[in-house]
């Protein structure tokens, strides 16, 4: 099963969008295996966004993600990366399709509400950065048989 890390960034938390965003993700049939409110440290932000180090926007990105509480969510399922990313929408909310999280709630690329893993490999890596194995809970849901074949 694929895993994806989803981060509801400080702007989503401050704007009171946790409920509407989680509702959309859950309605897609995603199985939450970990969820917590967290304050991202500078060290963790550097590890998470390390691939962008040296780019002009890196310092601002670290400053933004550490500026307030975030909601960190781990999800698991078949094709979860593709499902989450299509639900989230394009990185730039101006270009995100209506009906996506960023298309409906986003304002600009600098405050784009949400992070989602972009590959199964990154999903595994990112979930491990933010959650210990003890924090991940896997269980069967009665609805699973109606969601996947």
From Swiss-Prot:
Cofactor or coenzyme needed: Mg(2+)
Chief location: cytoplasm
Residues where ATP binds: 9, 57, 85, 91, 102, 112
Reaction(s) this enzyme catalyzes, per UniProt: a 2'-deoxyribonucleoside 5'-diphosphate + ATP = a 2'-deoxyribonucleoside 5'-triphosphate + ADP; a ribonucleoside 5'-diphosphate + ATP = a ribonucleoside 5'-triphosphate + ADP
A GO CC annotation given for this chain: cytoplasm
Superkingdom, taxonomy of origin: Bacteria
Gene Ontology BP terms: CTP biosynthetic process; GTP biosynthetic process; UTP biosynthetic process
This enzyme's EC code(s): 2.7.4.6
Pfam families cross-referenced by the UniProt entry: NDK
Active site: 115 (pros-phosphohistidine intermediate)
Alphabetical list of SUPFAM superfamilies matching this protein: Nucleoside diphosphate kinase, NDK
Keywords: ATP-binding, Cytoplasm, Kinase, Magnesium, Metal-binding, Nucleotide metabolism, Nucleotide-binding, Phosphoprotein, Transferase
Compartment(s): Cytoplasm
Coiled-coil parts of chain: none
MF GO annotations: ATP binding; metal ion binding; nucleoside diphosphate kinase activity
Physiological role: Major role in the synthesis of nucleoside triphosphates other than ATP. The ATP gamma phosphate is transferred to the NDP beta phosphate via a ping-pong mechanism, using a phosphorylated active-site intermediate.
Family: Belongs to the NDK family.
Assembly information from the UniProt record: Homotetramer.
Name by which UniProt lists this protein: Nucleoside diphosphate kinase
Gene designation: ndk
């Amino acid at each position: 099963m694929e895993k994806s890390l989803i981060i509801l960034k400080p702007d989503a938390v401050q704007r009171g969008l946790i409920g509407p965003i989680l509702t959309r993700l859950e309605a897609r049939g995603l199985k939450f295996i970990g969820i917590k409110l967290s304050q991202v440290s500078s060290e963790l932000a550097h590890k998470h966004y390390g691939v962008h180090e040296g780019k002009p926007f890196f310092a601002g990105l670290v400053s933004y993600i550490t500026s307030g509480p975030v909601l960190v969510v781990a999800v698991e399922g078949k094709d979860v990366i593709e499902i989450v990313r299509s639900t989230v929408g394009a990185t730039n909310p101006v270009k995100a399709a209506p009906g996506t999280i960023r298309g409906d709630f986003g304002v600009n690329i600098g405050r784009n509400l949400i992070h989602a893993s972009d590959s199964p490999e990154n999903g595994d890596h990112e979930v491990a950065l933010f959650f210990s194995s003890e924090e991940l809970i896997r269980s069967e849901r009665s609805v699973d048989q109606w969601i996947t074949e």
